[in-house]
Regions:
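Extracytoplasmic/lumenal acceptor-recognition loop(s) of multi-pass membrane glycoenzymes
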Residues: 88, 93, 485-513, 524-604, ...
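Periplasmic/ER-lumenal interhelical loops and adjacent helix-loop junctions
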Residues: 60-84, 242, 249-344, 369-374, ...
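Active-site-proximal, structured, solvent-exposed surfaces of multi-pass membrane proteins
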Residues: 69, 690-819
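Active-site lumenal/periplasmic loops and adjacent helix-entry segments of GT-C-fold
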Residues: 45-143, 147-177, 284-325, 753
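Membrane-embedded helix bundles of polyisoprenyl
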Residues: 35-37, 128-142, 146-231, 244-264, ...
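Contiguous transmembrane helix-bundle modules in multi-pass membrane proteins
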Residues: 188-194, 198, 208-212, 349-515, ...
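Start-transfer (signal-anchor) and selected internal transmembrane alpha helices
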Residues: 1-48, 237-249, 471-485, 802-819
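Hydrophobic alpha-helical membrane-insertion signals
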Residues: 15-94, 267-270, 502-505, 509-555, ...
Length: 819
């Protein structure tokens, strides 16, 4: 393909042949070696197993979220195979969506839960290495020199998004994914080869399709920039390029079919995706051109200089918190180099650089545009910070290349930029804020003096070296010094983010603390003595982090009632809302659900047979509802006296309208007598008695005999389970008259019921759970779960493969490779 003309101000000179350029294609191995070198020293205590890559501070998601998440999948795959439904996700949920949130974690899942948590750091470093490698080839696709490509690769591999993101287990893959999309874009743009772009879209779709929007926004602007960087605007060619991207992207989307559909519908059908997001109206109605306050702006500025200059972990003094504040650090040298691009390119080309920079800087000054970038779903930075870093890296690498080619540095731009950053790093940032409790206060950023001194010192050194690149006749030694400084800076700055934290040590895994506490012996005892299906609630947390761990059951392999899930099963949440377990008006409450531990009557109704506690006196009700059956260390095992099986029957019902009028305790008590039906379902209740408001009782009328008699009545005609597994339940029931059977798991369209061998629809009971209408007599019950979109998704996959095959055939016919 004929290369477009370069639009530079100064005629290009020949790059001086030196060590870096003489390496040729082998320069990749130098870049790779440097990535591995820096990664080792940044993460050495974790790689050498002195510490475990888990954090007890604000990064507690590694302990409370991601570790239980992947441990559960690994355990599930070993016992059940392909992920479908799990009773350990809340009180039951399909888990195919989210299975490949980070496809590289499949390594840990297939090795097994015993590999966790020690294996996580190796997977993360592997992702950094692969992401950096892909970005190197992207740099070379832009025709940069070997030296500039190596510098750019290192800046990318150890930018703030990559390193802080690694401490959240999520963002290293997302950085890798975008690097692949950028390389794929260049392959389409330059050589009409679409495979890598399709692969990038495929990986995004099986991981988290929502990212396709943010990636798409970046590619949209980057694609226009690249086209106009090298061509005059030509409508046919311009939109033809986007047409190729859409076609290549469509192939990737189609091939991802089963995961794409499952992921999309999990989001859409969750509380977060189906409405009630308290943030949307607030953010969408905020003033468009309201500026960031001083602390918000200062945090953005300071975290461009270093991710940890405002403190690490819980000592962070900026807005939000250490993980969710802006983190656009991408090497100090990039902050000085990027201003050099403007005097070294033509006026016509300069306007496109300025336009791209304004597009990505605007949300830093005007938060409304950052909210819009996230579709007003939250006050996030994350990918936005990363994209801003990428623009800085691209500009600085191009500027470095031009300096090396032309041996010219604009001294005014260099000194002005240096002074600007020295001033920005030194001034005070404070502003009035309103705390969540409504109180007013003043927040002031506090910088780490050691890191701040290092930053200013290196800014000055970099400025001197950049100046010398444009003046010295022999710049090879300067290039060596500059590269050594970049390697040292990235190692020094990055190690704070991972190491200056509250960390789980290797010794912790051997002590009877954290997830290795006496809960293990307690659960083992229960399982040895009870082979049936049951649920367990805990009144304490095992995780050991600053935030309580409500997904202990995923690590200790038992079924509970709590959930930590951004996209929880909607009927599970509706049930919790209906019984006032969580705030029905707060969407955030749907992501962190403590379960039924504080509601003993609901525990009885939902097959919570055991409670683990360290303080029996914590809930006086337990003295009447449970027996203490064992103790291990400081953990007491309580067994319910009033446990109901998985399925039991009601002969009474109460309408949803009447139920909603009851107090919290009345709701619990009435559910011991009647199930709750929607008003639309009332016409199908032939032969059943309706319970009205006058039939309900108050707490002062409650007796323990009332509880015993109610439980005995419900249990009298209940499901006798013959087979129970995650995806299949078989049993028998005999009822004396028409009744409603309550099954204590959320109603889901993936469950298929056969009543006496005939396909039968389940009904919604108690505002979220599964119900069946058994008529008088004996019945066989067969329930099977099938991922709803697996078959439809496989059809999309076949269509995608067919289209890809057609593309491959015609490209082969025209002697054009696809890769």
């Amino acid at each position: 393909m004929k290369q477009p003309k370069t639009k530079e101000t100064i005629p290009s000179q020949t790059i001086v042949s030196d060590f870096f350029e003489n390496l040729g294609n082998k320069s990749y191995f130098l870049a790779l070696s440097l990535i591995i070198f820096i990664a080792f020293f940044v993460f050495k205590d974790f790689l050498l197993l002195k510490n475990v890559f888990q954090f007890k501070d604000i990064g507690s998601d590694t302990l409370n979220g991601m570790y239980p998440y992947y441990h559960h999948y690994a355990d599930y795959i070993q016992k059940n195979g392909w992920p479908q439904w799990s009773f350990a996700e809340g009180m039951g949920q399909g888990i195919l969506s989210g299975f490949l949130r980070d496809p590289f974690q499949l390594i840990a899942m297939l090795i097994g839960p015993q590999s966790m948590p020690k294996i996580f750091i190796y997977i993360i470093v592997l992702e950094i290495i692969i992401a950096g490698s892909i970005f190197y080839f992207f740099m070379k696709a832009l025709k940069t020199t070997n030296y500039s490509a190596i510098i750019g690769t290192l800046l990318f591999s150890f930018c703030g998004f990559m390193i802080i993101g690694s401490c959240w287990y999520l963002f290293t893959f997302e950085a890798l994914n975008l690097a692949l999309l950028l390389l794929g874009f260049e392959r389409i743009y330059q050589k009409n080869k679409w495979f890598l772009f399709s692969l990038g879209i495929f990986l995004a779709a099986i991981s988290f399709p929502v990212n396709l929007f943010t990636y798409g926004v970046f590619i949209l602007f980057y694609g226009a920039f690249r086209f106009l960087q090298e061509n005059d605007f030509d409508k046919k060619k311009f939109f033809g390029l986007y047409g190729k991207l859409i076609m290549a992207g469509a192939i990737g989307l189609l091939i991802s079919g089963p995961f794409l559909l499952e992921n999309i519908f999990q989001v859409l059908e969750s509380p977060r995706g189906s409405g009630g997001d308290s943030y949307f109206d607030k953010l969408a109605n905020s003033p468009m051109f309201a500026t960031s306050n001083k602390v918000e702006f200062g945090t953005s500025v300071m975290r461009m200089l270093s991710s940890d200059i405002l403190g690490s972990g819980n000592s962070f003094s900026g807005i939000q918190n250490f993980l969710e504040a802006p983190f656009s650090y991408c090497g100090l040298i990039s902050l000085l180099l990027m201003s050099q691009i403007f005097p070294l390119i033509s006026k016509n080309l300069r306007k496109w650089y300025i336009a791209l920079l304004i597009i990505w800087l605007t949300p830093t000054f005007f938060p409304y545009f950052r909210y819009a970038f996230w579709l007003f779903s939250g006050d996030y930075y994350r990918a936005y910070s990363f994209f801003l870093s990428l623009v800085f890296i691209l500009f600085s690498v191009h500027a470095l290349d031009l300096i090396l080619k032309h041996k010219k540095v604009n001294l005014i731009a260099l000194i002005s930029t240096l002074i600007l950053w020295l001033i920005l790093s030194s001034i005070s940032y404070k502003s009035n804020i309103t705390y969540p409790n409504g109180q007013q206060g003043i927040q002031e950023l506090k910088s780490d003096d050691t890191i701040a001194f290092f930053v200013r010192l290196f800014l000055v050194f970099y400025a001197i070296l950049i100046f010398m690149l444009g003046k010295s006749k022999n710049i090879t030694n300067i290039k060596y010094i500059l590269l050594i400084m970049v390697v040292f800076e990235l190692t020094y700055i990055s190690q704070f983010s991972a190491n200056r934290r509250s960390i789980v040590s290797a010794r912790d895994l051997k002590e009877k603390i954290g997830y290795n506490d006496y809960s293990i012996e307690a659960i083992k005892y229960i399982k040895e003595n009870d082979k049936s299906f049951f649920r367990v609630d805990k009144s304490y947390f095992s995780g050991g982090a600053m935030h309580g761990s409500i997904t202990d059951h995923k690590v200790h392999s038992y079924y509970g009632t709590s959930s930590y899930n951004s996209f929880a099963q909607i009927n599970y949440i509706n049930y919790m809302r209906a019984y006032n377990v969580i705030d029905k008006n707060n969407e955030f409450a749907s992501r962190w659900v403590d379960g039924l531990i504080s509601r003993p009557f609901l525990e009885s109704l939902n097959h919570v047979k055991y409670v683990l506690t360290k303080e029996v006196s914590k809930n006086p009700v337990w003295l009447n509802t449970h027996d203490s059956v064992a103790k291990f260390g400081d953990v007491v095992v309580l067994k319910s006296k009033f446990n109901l099986p998985l399925g039991y029957t009601y002969n009474q019902y109460i309408s949803q309208t009447d139920f909603d009028l009851l107090s919290t305790i009345q709701k619990d008590l009435v559910s011991l007598k009647a199930c709750v039906l929607s008003d639309q379902e009332l016409s199908n209740t032939i032969g059943l008695k309706r319970l009205t408001l006058k039939d309900t009782i108050e707490l002062n009328q409650f007796t323990w005999n009332y509880l015993k008699n109610s439980v005995d009545s419900l249990k009298n005609e209940s499901l006798k389970t013959v087979l129970f597994s995650e995806n299949k339940i078989e049993g028998n029931i005999s009822v004396s008259k028409n009744k409603i059977m309550y099954l204590s798991f959320p109603k889901d369209k993936g469950w298929h019921l056969k009543l006496d061998g005939k396909e039968t629809e389940t009904i919604l009971v108690n505002n979220g759970m599964t119900g069946i209408y058994p008529s008088s007599g004996k019945h066989s019950i067969n329930l099977e779960y099938h991922s709803r979109f697996l078959n439809k998704g496989l059809i999309l996959t076949l269509v995608g493969i067919l289209i890809a095959g057609i593309f491959w055939f015609f490209n082969r016919k025209n002697k054009v490779a696809i890769i």
